[in-house]
């Protein structure tokens, strides 16, 4: 069989039944490729996580039409997250065809509990390995070994000395491999049997990306000093250097297989250059990225390197995980472009403009094709903003001592997070950030995306509040009440950005408080008054962060024993005016990047005047909410004017940071 998806899709042939009831404990129907093909065959997926929400969708979109005798091409697929189909309501059991799908059926010779921990992105590789090597029945450990070898190309038996281990970890963390914790534990236990690695902090650096790069960062100056001294007076004792992480002080950065990663790590901001007298070092290109030399030369070298890296990464048919990973590369490049004192030469500007155009086109094509498949993915690793509350609830459950602070910085783009993060590190070097990213709701408006982040629901489930944030605190409280918290356990604070008042401080210090939602709206206020484009945004964010509000807020939260998570409801983009629609009060929201209508015919009429604009399909939105999105890097304002705004579907607007903050 060509693909594991074919096994699943064989159960779903068009026009078999109006409704199919599917036991899908592994979430296979949510995989991007399957979801896309199911939609192409006319199947609409309805999750049964929430009976009330399910009934709303099923009764309004399907059953009422079937009962009226309407002929429709749509077929409903009710997805249950367990195998207990018989627990469904009687009317559904009578009307529906029953199907069960599982990873155990696709990988019969591998240990199901181990395979079930793998991200979907790796199932193609695992299936190909199974077809090629036809393993006999494998137990847990043998399955872990099989996955390491054939999915992640890690053969534990070949890791014998430091260069071998460094190469494996560099490849793993640079590529952002998502190895399941249970497989990581197996690998760590194997490595711990080697005396060569007895002092290495394997429990931390094997699985923790940020910790691994911090481990490398504090050893990079030692390596440079060794080169300068030509090997003389080098001490292997870590205590001499005051290292935070255990392990050898000197690492083989110059090994030919390792150094190919080093310049990439520096140019992408994963490692940071350190002061060193270049004259004392070998004249090797790969080292120069890691030392502070002439600022202008360093800037141009790094920006060219980042442009190369961005171009190399872009591929057809990228999955959502790849776009989230790519977004950080792109954000580093944008932050570098807009925060430097050095102007870009015309050739660099032309290359950047070409990149922006290419990314806009590829991302829009992907969004139109795959965005709908993201909505019902598991919140275990949040992919969209409305997944975050359920992710937080999982972390809160089971331990009454856990406290969570959910800090949303309204309007903060991912590239602006890079600037904010860098200043925070300067102000407090103990702060550590575990960085990931999530997709915002489209249209990327505060009333849509921010409310989804606090409600933990699709916007279609708060239709009366979709045009205002006045009841956002109620949505936040309602979500946590459904998780079993009382009103005294929950807090919500908005309008932050300048100072932390005594009233806010008292709220955060309440003994019973378990979860608090905080909104910093300073960035959004800067954006809506910005006349100097994206570069001006970065400058204002740099100045504001320097004032210390964010540092102080994070300190209060961490000192109060909160687990702190930062995100944004959407980003922003510099856009050029293409003219204002002449339609009076027809549009309910007359935004710069998006116009909202209650009637699709009114939207279509406006599109006729702006043929390159996009009639956004109302994915997850209320029935009377129709968005017309301005073309790439364009705005519905006076022709030729330039603003910074949001509402559209550029990667800068749609992919938002999701950060866990700790302090060493």
Where are the language model's segments positioned?
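…; additionally, a secondary subgroup of soluble metalloenzymes is captured
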Residues: 1-404, 411-564, 568-664
